[in-house]
Amino acid sequence: MAAASGYTDLREKLKSMTSRDNYKAGSREAAAAAAAAVAAAAAAAAAAEPYPVSGAKRKYQEDSDPERSDYEEQQLQKEEEARKVKSGIRQMRLFSQDECAKIEARIDEVVSRAEKGLYNEHTVDRAPLRNKYFFGEGYTYGAQLQKRGPGQERLYPPGDVDEIPEWVHQLVIQKLVEHRVIPEGFVNSAVINDYQPGGCIVSHVDPIHIFERPIVSVSFFSDSALCFGCKFQFKPIRVSEPVLSLPVRRGSVTVLSGYAADEITHCIRPQDIKERRAVIILRKTRLDAPRLETKSLSSSVLPPSYASDRLSGNNRDPALKPKRSHRKADPDAAHRPRILEMDKEENRRSVLLPTHRRRGSFSSENYWRKSYESSEDCSEAAGSPARKVKMRRH
C-alpha cells in the first residue's frame, strides 16, 4: 500500500506530511505579522490625521475651536470679576430673631411718624414700592439734580434731615462696634430703605465723593439678594444676569469695600423682593464732601449772600428740583418702569423738554387744556368776539 502511494516507507510519508504542516503554520504566522503591520500603519496614520476621509469634519472642528476659546475666555473673565467682588465683601450673622423683632418694631415706628408728617422735609423720600428715611446726613441724587451723573450729588445743609434715632445707636451701631465691624464714632449717616414686594433700586455706586468706605448694611423683615454688575433696561423693565448674586439673610450684616464698593455697581432686583424687606445703611460722610449751603432753595427771594453760600470749595452747587412722588403704589407698580426710582427715561425727558412740558410738574395734556381754557376766559372777560382757529395738519 505504501508502494502504491509512491512512498517506499511509512516513515517517508510521515516526514513529508510534517514538513507540509510546518509550511502552513509558517504561512499563518507571516499573514498575522503582515496584518499587524498594516494595523499599526493605519493607527499611525489616524493619529497624524484624525479625519483622513472626511474633510468637512476636520473643517468644522477647526472652526469651532475659536468659539469655544472665546466662551471659555468670557467665563474666565466673569469668574475673575466675581472673585474681585467677593474680595471686597464681608458678611456675618450678628442679630438674633428676638433682636430683629425689636429693631423691626422700631422701623415700623419710623414709618408711622413719617406718615404723620413728624419728620423734616428732606428726611423722607417716597417712591412706589420703596421709601427712604435719611438720618444724620441726607444727600441729593437721581432726578433731584438738574445736572445728573456721577459726582453731582450734594449733601443737604446741616439740620435739613433729622438726627439719627437713639435706638439705631443702641440696638444696631453699638453691636457693630462691639464686634469690631466699624470703629467707635464712625457712623454719622443712617438710611432706612423700606421695600414692598416687587420694589427695587437700579444699579448704582454709592457716591465716592460723598461717603467714606466701608459701607455697612443690616437686613430685616425677610431674606433677599444683592446683585453686582447688572444692567437695567426700561420699557419693559429687564435686568441682565449679575456678575455675582449675594444672598442677604434677615439679621445679617454686609460690609462693602474695595472693588465691591467702588469698581462695580450693585442693585436690588424686583424679583428678589418677594416680601417686605428693610435695610439700615450705615455710612460716614467725607470731610470734603460738597454740600448745599442754603436752606431755602425753592424760595424766589434769596439773601444777598446766596451766591457766595452756594460755593462749597471749588464746586458750585446745582439748584435742586423737588420731584418726589406721594402716590400710593398698587401691586403692579413694579412692572411700570416709568415710575421706578431713578427712571432713566424720565431723567432724559426732563432734561430735553422745556420746563412747562416736564412730567414732574404736570402732564402736557392737562397743561394745554388749562392754557386753552384760561385763554378763553380772558377773551370773554375782555369782551372780544370768539375767533375760529384753523388747525394746520402736519
UniProtKB/Swiss-Prot annotation:
Changing E153A: No effect on catalytic activity. Strongly reduced interaction with RBM33, leading to decreased RNA demethylase activity. One of its GO terms (molecular function) is 2-oxoglutarate-dependent dioxygenase activity. Fe cation binds at H204, D206, H266. Changing K86R: Decreased sumoylation. Abolished sumoylation, leading to increased mRNA demethylase activity. Disulfide bonds join C230-C267. One of its GO terms (biological process) is mRNA processing. The lineage of its organism: Eukaryota, Metazoa, Chordata, Craniata, Vertebrata. This is RNA demethylase ALKBH5. The gene is ALKBH5. It is found in: Nucleus speckle. The keyword RNA-binding does not apply. RNA demethylase activity is inhibited following sumoylation. Inhibition is relieved following desumoylation. Changing K390R: Does not affect sumoylation. Widely expressed, with highest expression in lung, followed by testis, pancreas, spleen and ovary. The modification Phosphotyrosine is found at Y71. Phosphorylated at Ser-87 and Ser-325 in response to reactive oxygen species (ROS), promoting sumoylation and inactivation. The active site is at Y139. Its EC number is 1.14.11.53.
